Structure formats: C-alpha cells, structure tokens
Amino acid sequence: MSTLLKSAALVLCAGVSCVQATETAKHWDFNIGAMYEIENVEGQGDDKDGLYEPSVWFNATWDAWTLSLAMYQEGPVDYSSMTRGTYFDRPEFELRYRFIGTDDFTFGLTGGFRNYGYHFKDEHGAKDGSANMQRYKIQPDWDLKLTDDWRFSGWFAMYQFANDLEKTGYSDSRVETETGFTWILNETISAKINYYLERGFNMDGSRNNGEFSTQEIRAYLPISLGSTTLTPYTRLGLDRQSNWDWQDDPEREGHDFNRLGLLYAYDFSNGLSMTLEYAYEWENHDEGENDRFHYAGVGVNYAF
C-alpha cells in the first residue's frame, strides 16, 4: 500500500479547480489525514488475524510545489491475544514539482525517500533482530486531454533500495507504473482503464533476492452522486511471477491474482472527507494451495 499515492490523489483532485480559479493568487493549501487498513488471507495462520496497517499523512502545496510526509506501519496481528508478529515502520518524504499545469496538459516530477524499520520476531513472539532499509524514488506523472471526453494519464516510478537487503529479502531495484485512458460519459459517470506493471530486479548480477513481476489491467467506474462518489473497480492479472522464498527456493513461482472492489467516498463540503473500501481477491499459485484474500480500509482527510 502506497499511502502518499492515495493522499496525493485527493490533493490533486481537490487542487485542480482551485489552481485554475485562482491562478494569480498564490497561497498555501494543506491536507492531513489518517487511514486504517486490514488484509487477510482466508484459512491461514501465518498472518494471524490479518495485516494491521495504520497510516497518517500531511501534504502542503504552494503554487507548483507539493511537500508530502507520511508514516505507515504493517505487520500481522492476533487481536484475541493483542500480540503482533514481525512488522515494519515506514516513514516517507516526497517533494513534487508541477512543470506544466493546465486543463489540456499537466506534467509533474516527484522525488522521494522512504525508510523501512523492520522488527523481527520468532515463532514464539520474541524479538529476533531488526533491519533498516532505505528506498529512493523518482517519479514523473502526466495528464493529457485528448478530447472533451477522453484523457490519457499516469505515472512511472523508479526505485532504488539500499542496506540490509539480505535481511529483508528485497531486490535492489524496482519499477512501477500505472497509465491509461479515462472516458467521461457525463457529469455523473466516467470509465477508466489502466495498464499496471510492478517489477523487482537486481542491478547487482550476483544477487537474485526478491525478484518479481506483476502485470495487470485495472478498470475503474467512478459514479458521482453529489457529495458521494462510488467507484467499483477490478484488477485482472495478466502475468505474475515471484521468488520471494529466495532463501530456500530461488526459482520463480507463477501466480494468477484477480480482484473486485468498491471504494465509497463522501465529501462533507467543509474540507472534511472520508473513504470506505472493500476488495475480494482470488489468488491462484503454481505451487501450494490457492488463496482467497480480503482487503478493507477506512480513511479520513481534512483539507484547509
């Protein structure tokens, strides 16, 4: 889960009309929010009662500059005993500059830094060491008006990981992108179809840790009903391979993941907004048993 991507989307959506309406009056726009997410695989004890994922964020925008700060945490939790397994803390900083910002074309560039502070635990719940890994990011984004009804938009991120990779199992490099077309049917309904790619690889030829590849078609159908926006969506897997079990089995394993979800968003028209989201995913694996996956999230955001 990328906390800053979700929060940045809210800022950009709220900021486009504001920038156009007050192009000559520069001022600060702030945005603060929090989210709680859970993820769970049916019938497995490895993740206990599921993954516990709280996050908070803060964004500040001045003219073409946007500064973003976030703190995210992830790890399995057992709510009956209130105990946790291995988890990590993930503070993050990003700075975006908008080079072009018109209704016809928007182009921006983001640089970012993220730290992963891992806290390992053994099978008995006792502390079992730690790791401290960093991720550096550069990401262009764009939004192009093709016609009154069609737009082409997306982003492309390049990541470099450093330190303690042998402990965390990560590859040293990664690319991630989501890009596609939006068709605006009317003021209420639009349709978006995107291509998504995420790939982890190693620039160091002596390593094969944590390499993977994911390709998906992602489709969204936002329905705007006044202050309420409902967005049913799906993710259709095209190709998915991984070797996350790199310590015992470096061979790549194939997967087939497909997801259906619904995002509910409500704008209170006073700067406050909230989201509710649920998704169900079918996860089929070449090796081992297939899984059924549930995701749920609730978020609140205040813009001022």
Please place each PLM-identified region on the residue numbering.
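Transmembrane beta-barrel strands of outer-membrane/channel proteins
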Residues: 32-38, 60, 69-73, 109-115, ...
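Short glycine/proline- and aromatic-enriched beta-strand/turn motifs that initiate or cap beta-hairpins
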Residues: 21-81, 295
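Cleavable N-terminal export/targeting peptides
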Residues: 1-33, 66, 103-105, 303-304
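Outer-membrane beta-barrel "beta-signal"
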Residues: 223, 266, 278-280, 290-304
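Repeated loop/turn-to-beta-strand initiation elements of outer-membrane beta-barrel proteins
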Residues: 63-69, 102-109, 146-154, 186-193, ...
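Outer-membrane beta-barrel architecture
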Residues: 55-59, 94-96, 139-141, 178-182, ...
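Detector for outer-membrane/organellar transmembrane beta-barrel domains
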Residues: 142-244
